[in-house]
A protein has these predicted regions:
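N-terminal metal-binding scaffold of metallo-dependent hydrolase/deaminase domains
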Residues: 1-54, 66
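Alpha-helical scaffold segments that flank or form the walls of functional sites
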Residues: 85-155, 179-193
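Glycine-enriched alpha-helix->loop->beta-strand junction motifs that scaffold or abut catalytic
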Residues: 154-156, 220-225, 261-264, 281-290, ...
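His/Asp/Glu-enriched, well-ordered alpha-helical/loop segment
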Residues: 258-265, 307-396
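Metal-coordinating catalytic core of metallo-dependent amide/deamination hydrolases
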Residues: 141-271
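Active-site gating loops and adjacent loop-to-helix segments of metal-dependent hydrolytic enzymes
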Residues: 83-113, 161-176, 235-265, 288, ...
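C-terminal cap of metal-dependent C-N hydrolases
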Residues: 20-22, 381-436
């Protein structure tokens, strides 16, 4: 089995940084090494020490002077929306009805689903993303195509077919029973196969009847180790419509709460307009509020109050995500940049150490997967991104005046995109250069 020895400036986080000067929250090696074998990081530290453990047969790839970090993690994205990203002029509910739902009906075709699933995952790799929590369409074939493509690439993914039995067009609705049956079959076929993990996925309360929400709760009780993902409190019209459909609920969050869908593996996309009671309910259950800045800005949904949610008496667990195709970029670097701006509009700041922690270890913690991904710790899965802070002329001229690691990270998140991603390693193997036909030459 080939052993790969990477050399470069290695950076990983030990905990959430408390500010731009909190270097105790990270481990940085100016001349670092990572030894990869069998899809895992088997040694990490100063290059000289790791090289001594590698043996003469290790293949060396020298990435100096670039930064080597854990692969970026996207905690909310829609695979079937690749061909409606950048669709003009609608708020959430109109956008779904005008663009998204008609597009997702195409995923009843297994060939189409397979094509888009492969393109979607390859695009993430180009952007340095190594794990995604993904929504497939309502069709079982869509989820099968996604998991098959991810398994072939040995990518760790969390995904599920959406459950939706109302307020959607013909060809995009299931039933409570068919949703249960399809989900059970997909769990049996894919959960734990290789690096694939299943998420029970009621799209949102508007598109599920109470009977289907009961089914989602039953699935969670039957499979308490699974993730659950849905949408919550994204848009004022969405909230009002939800409460019309569930008049007995105290608020939007209570709809999910009464069906047993809150918990530490529950991922709630958006969470922009939460009441204090709702935020308390999420916090007490350990549920995750997923920040989707490019989508929230593009659809005019509102501003996620990231710092307030984290600092409140009962803090929320948070994650960061692209939400493509409502989101406007597959890049977590671009998403971090837009997140910074959203937080600034609330009169706060998110420092670059905090941004990169969130997109790596922080998102891994949100997925309850930090023992496997999100760090460069020995024993972790070898999902890695190599970033070049001088990837473009404008980045190079700015870098001439940089004097700290934090400034370099801020440059990467402000001006960086897929061009800054030198290489993406998935399960210990180079993945981006293979896509681009530019496999890194060993030295």
């Amino acid at each position: 089995m080939t052993r790969l020895l990477l050399r470069g400036r290695t950076l990983t986080f030990l905990r959430r940084p408390e500010g731009v000067g909190d270097v105790a929250a990270l481990r940085y090696e100016e001349d670092g090494g990572l030894l990869l074998e069998g899809g895992r990081i088997v040694a990490a530290g100063p290059y000289a020490e790791v090289e001594a453990k590698a043996g003469a047969d290790a293949e060396i790839v020298d990435h100096r002077p670039n930064l080597i970090l854990p692969g970026l993690i996207d905690t909310h994205a829609h695979m079937p929306q690749m061909q409606v990203i950048a669709s003009y002029g609608a708020e959430l509910l109109d956008w779904l009805n005008k663009y998204t739902f008609p597009e997702e009906t195409r995923f009843s075709d297994p060939d189409h689903a397979r094509r888009i699933a492969g393109l979607f995952l390859d695009e993430l790799v180009r952007q340095g993303t190594t794990t995604v929590a993904a929504y497939c369409s309502v069709h079982r074939a869509s989820a099968e195509a996604f998991f098959s493509a991810a398994h072939a690439r040995d990518m760790l993914t969390v995904a599920g077919k959406v459950m939706m039995d109302r307020n959607a067009p013909d060809g995009l609705r299931d039933t409570p029973q068919s949703a249960y049956d399809d989900t059970k079959a997909l769990i049996a076929a894919w959960h734990g196969k290789g690096r694939q993990l299943y998420a029970i996925t009621p799209r949102f309360a508007i598109t599920s009847t109470p009977e289907q929400m009961e089914v989602a709760g039953a699935l969670m009780r039957e499979h308490p180790d699974l993730h659950m993902q849905t949408h919550l409190s994204e848009n004022h019209a969405e909230i009002a419509f939800t409460l019309e459909l569930y008049p007995e609920a105290r608020d939007y969050t209570d709809v999910y709460e009464r069906y047993g869908l809150l918990g530490r593996r529950a991922l709630f996309g958006h969470c922009i307009h939460l009441s204090e009671r709702e935020a308390d309910a999420l916090a007490e259950s350990g549920s995750v509020a997923v920040f989707c800045p490019t989508s929230n800005l593009f659809l005019g949904s509102g501003l996620f109050d990231y710092q307030r949610y984290r600092r409140r008496g009962r803090p929320l667990r948070t994650a960061l995500a692209t939400d493509v195709g409502g989101g406007t970029n597959y890049s977590m670097l671009r998403t971090m940049d837009e997140g910074y701006k959203v937080i600034a509009l609330s009169g706060e700041k998110l420092d670059p150490l905090g941004s990169f922690w969130q997109a790596t270890r922080g998102n891994a913690e949100a997925l309850s997967l930090v023992e496997r991904i999100g760090t460069l710790d020995e024993g972790s899965d070898a999902d890695i991104v190599v970033l070049d802070s001088g990837a473009t002329p404008s980045m190079r001229i700015r870098r001439e005046r940089i004097t700290s690691l934090a400034e370099e990270l801020f440059l990467l998140q402000t001006l960086g995109d897929d061009r800054a991603v030198v290489e993406t390693y998935v399960s210990g193997r180079p993945a981006k250069s293979v896509l681009d036909g530019l496999a890194a030459a060993p030295v």
